[in-house]
Amino acid sequence: MGIFYRMFTNNFRTIRSLLLSVLLLSGLLTGCVSSNKLFKMDGDSGTKETLPVHVEVLVEMAEYCNKIYDDGEELGDNEFAYNVVQDRGVTIIIFRGPNNGRNVVTDLDARPFNDRKLSANIHRGFRDAATKLRDEIIENHALEESIILTGHSLGGAVAQIIGLWLEDDAYDVQIYTFGSPAITTASFGDAAIHFRMALRNAPVPLLPPIPYRHWGIAIDPETLTWSENNEIGDFTKIDARDHSIKEYLNILRKHEVTQSQTGR
């Protein structure tokens, strides 16, 4: 069981957690890992010309994620932080986790948890963190009907889970994640809108291992090609530099400049 503490810094709340560490052995992930709910997926894909979201929106979400790092203090291995912005009738919730996301993913309790609200198995450690963050947010903030959730790395993991819960509560939800790990063994094809940015050599999106899987519309920030098929990256070409939120932001800004110059 996780033990959570609360602290307040620089206008955003930090959840400090001591989560049970487990060894990610293949045997631990077998057994009751199949989902009781498999959502239909259309499997659409395309190029930047048919990208189903404006690049300016992706840049804005990346800027929010970058700002929560710049404005906040260094987080410990099992700490998560969030910030809430109210903007013209839309609630924007930004999440972040610790800087060493890859190590923390392997430390968290990775056993699948049968989430009855979603009728699906989700990552137990991410769910524990998301539960505490959701309770904090609901207790301290009035939420609009339209909610955008965004997060980088482990922040993207809790953004997904909380977004799915809020969508189940009839909120109008959109989720934007950058370099997030997988959170479920299910395919939430017809659930909340989720735009998932993942650089091809980033390490954290490759975790945790099968049977966990990604869901949503995967976007390659470098080419702006997109797909609902969520192909896995290559373990042999991992580059830790590709995981920085600043890397995502710099790449997306270049697309924004190119579009303004070409008028597209």
PLM segments and residue spans:
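N-terminal leader/targeting segments
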Residues: 1-3, 145
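Bacterial N-terminal signal peptides
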Residues: 19-30
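Bacterial N-terminal signal peptides that target proteins for export
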Residues: 5-19
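Non-catalytic, mobile gating and regulatory segments of ester bond hydrolases
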Residues: 33-150, 154-264
